């Protein structure tokens, strides 16, 4: 028998790489040939799974405006990789989706100097539809690919994600209205 140990990260407990190694070792102890192959869904830990190395650390604002350091990583081909969760992470000790902002991710992206950029979304404290990011970044610094674990329109995002960020039912409704207004301002795909 052979086994393939391919977990994603276990939030706050183990990275995908460490979880895969431990699972594979457990299989081997049971006499099973095993290979560790960590995976990621575009959220936390994606940069590590892709083999991106830290190129520099920059000071950004967390979701509540407090300073924190976040890495800009690079793949072997020079593509820059940033993870939203490293700039504006979801912290279970501070859940306030009405004030959490994506501005820090914008600050991180604004510091990127590369020919290509990969942005990994997920594991964030905010439900602002990228409004904070847009305050800082008017134009992306390079052709950009976004990795995310769920494709959800702005109009459904608060219902889907705000409760995990601490929103009450009334706050979810308020956030839904705010995101619906924001979606009216966003251009349609393929239109300026």
Q: Where are the model-predicted features located?
A:
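N-terminal loops that bind phosphate or other acidic moieties
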Residues: 1-192
């Amino acid at each position: 028998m052979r086994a393939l140990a391919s977990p994603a990260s276990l939030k706050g407990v183990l990275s995908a790489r460490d979880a895969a190694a431990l699972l594979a070792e457990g299989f081997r102890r049971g006499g099973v040939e095993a290979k560790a192959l960590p995976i990621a869904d575009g959220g936390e830990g994606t940069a590590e799974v892709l083999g991106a190395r830290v190129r520099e650390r920059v000071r950004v604002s967390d979701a509540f405006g407090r300073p924190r350091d976040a890495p800009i990583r690079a793949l072997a081909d020079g593509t820059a990789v940033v993870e939203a969760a490293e700039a504006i992470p979801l912290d279970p000790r501070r859940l306030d989706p009405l004030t959490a902002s994506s501005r820090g991710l914008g600050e991180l992206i604004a510091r990127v100097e590369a020919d290509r950029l990969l942005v990994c979304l997920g594991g964030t404290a905010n439900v602002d539809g990228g409004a904070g990011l847009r305050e800082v970044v008017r134009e992306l610094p390079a052709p950009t690919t976004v990795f995310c674990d769920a494709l959800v329109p702005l109009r459904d995002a608060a219902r889907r994600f705000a409760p995990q960020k601490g929103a009450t039912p009334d706050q979810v409704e308020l956030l839904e209205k705010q995101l619906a207004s924001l979606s009216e301002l966003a251009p349609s795909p393929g239109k300026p």
